[in-house]
């Protein structure tokens, strides 16, 4: 690693709430994320909840992008952990486009989708 590169791996619980299931027409109303300890997955920082009703959707998306590290070039600065991350991915991607922002691609970095883990633990059943 070079001296000026970030070398920490940061795991984050990630979840969103929306007004519907279609990212073209529904909007994100909350973004929740919390930094987790890498080895134990225990919370090491407070849960952050960005609320659309306190500002607007574009503002919470911009705040999430700027504060979380999700858009950093260093892929390990924000490793999302959540259940059914495809849902979050489709909303982040489309709602950023709808709000004139650079789309967030949470699958262009390491991630852990707990839905996959649950299916495996349930012998392939969902």
Residues covered by each model-derived region:
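Conserved RNase H-like, two-metal-ion catalytic cores of nucleic-acid enzymes
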Residues: 1-70
